[in-house]
């Protein structure tokens, strides 16, 4: 199925690209999320007429994401207290929701879907580096300090 991308999509293309994707991917993900429209003649003409407007909107979103990433990077360290055993192992774990709540409490709004934990959830006390994907091409980094209660 041919679609016109309205946003940058990882491993697919950027704004204005006409790409061929499977019908289910387009129908169930790209179109409902507003990332693409079917490439009909009407949509192609409509897109070409609004291309500059869409590019400006995309640039504004990218600028806002960069500003949020700077705020997140400015935090440097966020502390989370959790119950832990003698050897520093946590009772339970600290996941994306806990990290997002702690960063939000520190003053920067973050959704749990933006938190990236490459090594899985945090299960030990100490300092852990956590990445945030604020936008498809904007990343931020914070040190999470897990302390025992």
Swiss-Prot record:
Q: Which NCBIfam families match?
A: L9
Family recorded in the similarity comment: Belongs to the bacterial ribosomal protein bL9 family.
Tell me what gene encodes this: rplI
Record-given protein name: Large ribosomal subunit protein bL9
* UniProt xrefs under InterPro entries: Ribosomal_bL9 (IPR000244), Ribosomal_bL9/RNase_H1_N (IPR009027), Ribosomal_bL9_bac/chp (IPR020594), Ribosomal_bL9_C (IPR020069), Ribosomal_bL9_C_sf (IPR036791), Ribosomal_bL9_N (IPR020070), Ribosomal_bL9_N_sf (IPR036935)
Is RNA-binding set as a keyword in this record? yes
**Record carries keyword Coiled coil:** no
Organism equals: Salmonella arizonae (strain ATCC BAA-731 / CDC346-86 / RSK2980)
Purpose? Binds to the 23S rRNA.
What keywords sit in the KW lines?
Ribonucleoprotein, Ribosomal protein, RNA-binding, rRNA-binding
Q: Name one GO biological process term.
A: translation
Q: Which GO terms describe its molecular function?
A: rRNA binding; structural constituent of ribosome
